Amino acid sequence: MEVKAKQLDSVNATASVKIPSGMIKSEVENLAKKASKSVKMDGFRPGKVPVSAVLKRYERELTQDAEQNLFKSAVNSALQELKKENKELVGEPYFEKFDRKDGEIIAELILSFKPEIKLEGYEKLIPEYQTPKVSKKEIDEKKDELLKRFATPEAIKTKRALKEGDFAKFDFEGFVDDKAFEGGKAENYVLEIGSKQFIPGFEDGMVGMKIGEEKDIKVTFPKEYGAAHLAGKDAVFKVKLHEIQELKIPELDDEMLKKLLPGEEKASVEVLDEKLKEQIKNEKLFKLVNDELKGKFADALIEKYNFDLPKGIVEQETDMQMRAAFNTFSEKEIEELKASKEKYQEKRDSFKEEAQKSVKLTFIIDELAKLRKIEVNDQELIQAIYFEAYRYGMNPKEHLENYKKQGALPAVKMALIEEKLFNDIFIPKTEKSEKVSKKEKEDK
C-alpha cells in the first residue's frame, strides 16, 4: 500500500492512497479465517466452517470491512508522516477521489484538524440594545389570560340570542337521507360556539338561536371525514337549544392570588404584577435575542475572525445542506440535476459559502463556550430530547434512540451550548444596559 501525505494549510492535509488488489484480497481472507471460527452456518459444526464457504456467502461484507480496515491503516500512516495524532482529527476523512480499477483502489482523502482560534476583543462585537420595557397594559392583559384559565361557563339570566364565544347546551340528532346515523345523537351536549369542534357549518347554523328554539341545520360532511360512510354526504341535524352559557372570569381575590402564586408567603396583586412584569420582560428579551441579536453577533464574529477551515467538515456540511434543499426542489429540477453532473455540481457549489459560514461559526461558538466555561452535561442533553419528544407527543426513549442512530447527539448538544452561551452573553448585558440608561438619565 502506498500512502503519501501533504499538509495543505494549518488545518488540512491530503492523503494519496493506492491499495493493490492483492492486499485487499489478503485482508479479506484474514477476516474470513477469523469469521470461520465463530460464524454459524447450516451443515457445519461451530468453529468448523470452511473459509471458502464464509467467502462465498459473505464476500461483499468482508470486502467492505477489509477496505475499511486498510483505509484506517492508510490514515494512521498519513498521520505519522504529518506528525499528527488521531485525536487531532475533526470529522471523518473526506474522500475527494475514489477510483477502483482491476481490483486496485486509488483514492485521495482530505484529513482535517481542529483550528486554533484567538477571539481577542469579541466583547466589543456584542450588539447594544435597549432593555425591553413592560407596560401596565401588558401586565393587565397577562393577568386576564391567567384568570381566564380558571373561568367556568355559567348559564345567562338575560334573554338573548346565541352568539360566537358562548357555550351552548343542546340536544341534537343527525340524519343522512332521512335516516338517523350511528353516533349522531346526544342530549345536553355543551359546545363552545366558534371553537370549530363540529363539522363546518354546524356552529354557524346555531348562531342566533334562542333558548327553547328548535332548528334543522343542513351541513355537508368533509370528503376526508374519518367515518367513510358519512364522508362527503349531505346531512340534517335537528337541534334544540336548552341553555346559553358565558364564561365567568373569577375575581382576583386572596384565594385566587394563592392559586396564581403557589408557595408565595405574601401573595398580593403587587407581587403578581412584579412576577408577570419579569416574565414578560424575559419573553421579550428571549425574542429579541433570537430574532435579532444572535444574528447580528454571529455575523460580526464571522466577519472579524479569519482562520483556516477544515475542508472535510465544510464538504460534509455542503453535502448536508444540499440534501436538505432537495426537499424544496421541484420534480423537474431534481430530474435535471440527476441528468447533468455539471448542473448538480453547480447547484452544490451554491451552498458552499453558507456551509463555510456555518462551520466557521460552529468553531467560534465552541471556543467562546470554553472561554466562558459553558457546558452541557449528558443529563441536560437527555432532558432536552425528552422535552422535545413530550412536546410532539413522541416516545422519549425512542426519540433519544433515533438521535443516537442518526449520530445527531453532538449537533443537539452544540445547539444547547449555543443557547446557553447567548443567554450568558446577553442576560448580563441587560443589567449593564439598565445601569447605563439610569446614568444617562441622571446626566441629562
Swiss-Prot record:
Q: What is its EC number?
A: 5.2.1.8
On the tree of life, the source organism's domain of life is Bacteria
> Which enzyme class, named as a word?
isomerase
Pfam hit, one: FKBP_C
Entry's localization field: Cytoplasm
User: For this protein, what is any one GO molecular function term?
Assistant: peptidyl-prolyl cis-trans isomerase activity
Quote a single Gene Ontology cellular component term: cytoplasm
InterPro entries, from UniProt?
PPIase_dom_sf, PPIase_FKBP_dom, Trig_fac, Trigger_fac_C, Trigger_fac_C_sf, Trigger_fac_ribosome-bd_bac, Trigger_fac_ribosome-bd_sf, Trigger_fact/SurA_dom_sf
UniProt keyword terms in alphabetical order: Cell cycle, Cell division, Chaperone, Cytoplasm, Isomerase, Rotamase
What biological processes does GO assign it?
A: cell division; protein folding; protein transport
Q: Where is the PPIase FKBP-type domain?
A: 165-250
Q: Which reaction equation describes what this protein catalyses?
A: [protein]-peptidylproline (omega=180) = [protein]-peptidylproline (omega=0)
Entry comment, domain topic: Consists of 3 domains; the N-terminus binds the ribosome, the middle domain has PPIase activity, while the C-terminus has intrinsic chaperone activity on its own.
Family named by the database record: Belongs to the FKBP-type PPIase family. Tig subfamily.
The task this protein performs is described as:
Involved in protein export. Acts as a chaperone by maintaining the newly synthesized protein in an open conformation. Functions as a peptidyl-prolyl cis-trans isomerase.
Q: Give the protein name, as stated in the record.
A: Trigger factor
Which organism is this protein's natural source?
Answer: Campylobacter jejuni subsp. jejuni serotype O:2 (strain ATCC 700819 / NCTC 11168)
